[in-house]
């Protein structure tokens, strides 16, 4: 994972990844929702020479951190996702550090590129094709290991960030 920096929420996430991939892995910790302008500017500087991978927890704060970073950067951002189902059932926390090694490797092997400048689907297309309906949102969310609770507006934004077209989304729903 040379020239890659994985953005995580905390120390336990970094420790988990380094246990799997070795101590040479480079992570950047946001300290949860404590991500501020100084950290965002540090990530922006790092993005000039490195591939940025966001790997946050599969919960509300993780989603918020991910959105904050993507909206701040002017480059492609790579995203790794684990689902809540990948978390140890005995854990009280829903975090990356509690995910299985297999789930973490699968997530990092299947990165999704986001770019905030993408506009691949209009709101009219989104509504006309019933992508906003909860049942369809859940199918789409599960396909990408996103939260099933994601709002219609958030999913619309994220589908554009992924540069998905109507036919791509129809294929996902039809699977």
UniProtKB/Swiss-Prot annotation:
Mg(2+) 1 binds at residues 9, 57. SMART domains: TOPRIM. Required for correct processing of both the 5' and 3' ends of 5S rRNA precursor. Cleaves both sides of a double-stranded region yielding mature 5S rRNA in one step. Belongs to the ribonuclease M5 family. HAMAP family: RNase_M5 (MF_01469). It is found in: Cytoplasm. This is Ribonuclease M5. InterPro entries: RNase_M5, RNase_M5_C, TOPRIM_dom. Residues 3-83 form the Toprim domain. The gene is rnmV. Keywords: Cytoplasm, Endonuclease, Hydrolase, Magnesium, Metal-binding, Nuclease, Ribosome biogenesis, RNA-binding, rRNA processing, rRNA-binding. Transmembrane segments: none annotated. It catalyses: Endonucleolytic cleavage of RNA, removing 21 and 42 nucleotides, respectively, from the 5'- and 3'-termini of a 5S-rRNA precursor. The keyword Metal-binding applies. Pfam families: DUF4093, Toprim. Gene3D superfamilies: 3.40.1360.10. GO terms for cellular component: cytoplasm. It comes from the Bacteria. The keyword Magnesium applies. GO terms for molecular function: metal ion binding; ribonuclease M5 activity; rRNA binding. It is an enzyme of class 3 (hydrolase).
């Amino acid at each position: 994972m040379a020239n890659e920096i994985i953005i995580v929420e905390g120390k336990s996430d970094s420790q988990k990844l380094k246990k799997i991939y070795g101590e040479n892995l480079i992570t950047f910790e946001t300290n949860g929702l404590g991500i501020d302008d100084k950290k965002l500017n540090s990530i922006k500087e790092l993005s000039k020479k490195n591939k940025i991978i966001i790997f946050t927890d599969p919960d509300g704060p993780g989603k918020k951190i991910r959105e904050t970073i993507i909206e701040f950067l002017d480059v492609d951002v790579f995203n790794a996702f684990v689902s809540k189902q990948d978390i140890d059932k005995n854990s009280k926390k829903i975090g990356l550090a509690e995910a299985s090694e297999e789930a973490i490797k699968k997530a990092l092997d299947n990165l999704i590129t986001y770019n905030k400048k993408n506009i691949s689907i209009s709101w009219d297309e989104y509504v006309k094709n019933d992508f906003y309906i909860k049942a369809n949102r859940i199918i789409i969310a599960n396909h990408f290991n996103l939260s099933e609770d994601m709002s219609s507006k958030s999913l619309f934004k994220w589908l554009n960030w992924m540069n998905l077209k109507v036919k791509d989304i129809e294929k996902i729903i039809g699977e």
